């Protein structure tokens, strides 16, 4: 069954979620996992795309927009994930997508911004009611 991890970030800045998303994607990619970053909108996806290119100085995380290269180890999308991305879903939307059960793990990133925090509470309740194993991670300041 899919395991859902909530990463609680001590920041009110929604862009802190993108920084943590890059860290998680890099770690998963280095472990050989296929990663799907489910973005809320095109602006968020574009910003995340730029961050992944320059995440660690001259190094970058190999990635692609989901509709451009389904074989990239890290895909950024707005809808259904490419067929081979089933290891880690990093969900940056305010809802739990219907394709959650297709993944081994799901990462939900939470900041102190009221709308994001409330959406996270709603998703936590939803996942718990569906019987998903839940894990809570309190991150240090970034």
UniProtKB/Swiss-Prot annotation:
Keyword Transferase part of the UniProt annotation: yes
Catalytic activity: DNA(n) + a 2'-deoxyribonucleoside 5'-triphosphate = DNA(n+1) + diphosphate
EC numbers, comma separated: 2.7.7.7
Listed Pfam families: DNA_pol3_chi
Record's keyword terms, sorted: DNA replication, DNA-directed DNA polymerase, Nucleotidyltransferase, Transferase
Keyword Transmembrane: no
Database matches in Gene3D superfamilies: DNA polymerase III subunit chi (3.40.50.10110)
Gene Ontology molecular function: DNA binding; DNA-directed DNA polymerase activity
SUPFAM superfamilies, per the entry: DNA polymerase III chi subunit
Any single GO BP term: DNA replication
Similarity-based family: Belongs to the DNA polymerase III chi/HolC chain family.
Subunit-structure text: DNA polymerase III contains a core (composed of alpha, epsilon and theta chains) that associates with a tau subunit. This core dimerizes to form the POLIII' complex. PolIII' associates with the gamma complex (composed of gamma, delta, delta', psi and chi chains) and with the beta chain to form the complete DNA polymerase III complex. Interacts directly with the psi subunit (holD). The only subunit of the DNA polymerase III holoenzyme known to interact with single-stranded DNA binding protein (SSB).
Free-text function comment from the UniProt entry: Part of the beta sliding clamp loading complex, which hydrolyzes ATP to load the beta clamp onto primed DNA to form the DNA replication pre-initiation complex. DNA polymerase III is a complex, multichain enzyme responsible for most of the replicative synthesis in bacteria. This DNA polymerase also exhibits 3' to 5' exonuclease activity.
The protein, known as: DNA polymerase III subunit chi
Lineage, uppermost ranks: Bacteria, Pseudomonadati, Pseudomonadota, Gammaproteobacteria, Pseudomonadales
């Amino acid at each position: 069954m899919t395991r859902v991890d909530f990463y609680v970030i001590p920041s009110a800045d929604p862009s802190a979620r993108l920084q943590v998303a890059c860290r998680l994607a890099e770690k998963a990619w280095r472990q050989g996992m296929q990663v799907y970053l489910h973005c809320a909108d095109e602006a968020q996806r574009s910003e995340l795309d730029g961050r992944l290119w320059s995440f660690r100085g001259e190094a970058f995380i190999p990635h692609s927009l989901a509709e451009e290269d389904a074989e990239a180890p890290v895909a950024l999308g707005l809808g259904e994930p490419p067929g081979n991305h089933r290891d880690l879903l990093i969900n940056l939307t305010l809802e739990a997508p219907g394709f959650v059960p297709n993944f081994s793990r799901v990462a939900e990133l939470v900041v102190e911004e009221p709308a994001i925090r409330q959406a996270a509470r709603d998703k936590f309740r939803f996942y718990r009611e569906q019987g998903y194993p839940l894990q809570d991670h309190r991150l240090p300041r970034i």
